[in-house]
Amino acid sequence: METQHSRFLQYITHGSLVKQILLGLAAGIILASLSTQAALAAGLLGTLFVGALKAVAPILVLMLVMASVANHQQGQKTNIRPILFLYLIGTFSAALIAVVLSVLFPSTLALNAQAADITPPSGIVEVLKGLLMSVVANPIHALLNANYIGILVWAVGLGLAFRHGSASTKNLISDASHAVTAIVRVVIRFAPLGIFGLVASTLAETGFGALWGYAHLLMVLIGGMLLVALVINPLIVYWKIRSNPYPLVLRCLRESGVTAFFTRSSAANIPVNMELCRKLNLNEDSYSVAIPLGATINMAGAAITITVLALAAVHTLGIEVDIATALLLSVVASICACGASGVAGGSLLLIPLACSMFGISNDIAMQVVAVGFIIGVLQDSAETALNSSTDVIFTAAVCQAEDAKLAEKERLNLL
């Protein structure tokens, strides 16, 4: 009996997390179909799990980045520039794909939904201003509000200052980052329970009946995200690593995308991505900065959402769109997507900004936003899964490419 108990504990603490998550997913679906009340009650597990991830993510980013910068050795590469370049290329490519799909399969909307009572940003300048104001945020305020741009700036600044500190100070910071990482691993082991609760409560609260009226729009949105995840991202990774990209892409989708799909929060998924980067044996100096940065500005899914819904409004109103305007929309959607994390309501509240390019009134644009909230149970989940998994994919691609270059140099030096 004791042996069976120890085996069960061993499976819970060291078993395959992906298999456990799939079990939690299946159990959540079964519970929601059997008892709505029990499923709603199980939602507490999901709320606690997402809350725990959101609680630990800001301090994890602060400590990891600060420790990484403070202990950085002179001449050691961090690879941030090439990773940032891939983030921007990926987001713009996603916006282009969304334009192409919207032209090939135009969606129309019944614009009679009640406008959401939220004020969207008035222009790109306001979005960029919000992003820049995040940089100069009070550090305590940044930690409390999970402002990752502000946290990154303070972490890098403190890390640079601590470079001049004593060895014991640097060791203390490094030990503190390891301690926070250990807490994160414990939280992540509760993912199966969290996803069980999230799935059960979501199905019990909404079901999927409300989504059938927007089936065509959802097919274009999710089809675009799948195309980016399974075709565009692998092409970008192949261009970088010059080998089969699918083992890396599929692993990131499985281990990062699945969790992000159910938590629906890029910030909450930062600890999951950090742990995956550690498992992939990537350079900590690179991923400790690139992952939280990606959670803020790498928004391929948001670019697709903004573009598809804006063009759905355009098609509904019978407005003609030429190639030049479509390209401009891709650029605008990419810039908006990069600022989506700094806007309450995320990508949906940036749709009026894209609609304004076509002279669409704010009243109609906010009705499009209301449609976005209706389909959000799937749209937001798929968007977050694409955004978050892409952070790891591009970070890993750059790190692996740099490792391959170093190995080649060493081989040539030995000849």
UniProtKB/Swiss-Prot annotation:
Gene3D superfamilies: Sodium:dicarboxylate symporter (1.10.3860.10). One of its GO terms (cellular component) is plasma membrane. Keywords: Amino-acid transport, Cell inner membrane, Cell membrane, Membrane, Symport, Transmembrane, Transmembrane helix, Transport. The keyword Cell inner membrane applies. The chain crosses the membrane at residues 21-41, 45-65, 83-103, 142-162, 193-213, 217-237, 299-319, 331-351, 358-378. It is a multi-pass membrane protein. It is found in: Cell inner membrane. It catalyses: L-serine(in) + Na(+)(in) = L-serine(out) + Na(+)(out); L-threonine(in) + Na(+)(in) = L-threonine(out) + Na(+)(out). Pfam families: SDF (PF00375). GO terms for molecular function: neutral L-amino acid:sodium symporter activity. Disulfide bonds: none annotated. InterPro entries: Na-dicarboxylate_symporter (IPR001991), Na:dicarbo_symporter_sf (IPR036458), Ser_Thr_transp_SstT (IPR023025). GO terms for biological process: serine transport; threonine transport. Involved in the import of serine and threonine into the cell, with the concomitant import of sodium (symport system). Belongs to the dicarboxylate/amino acid:cation symporter (DAACS) (TC 2.A.23) family. This is Serine/threonine transporter SstT. It comes from Pectobacterium carotovorum subsp. carotovorum (strain PC1).
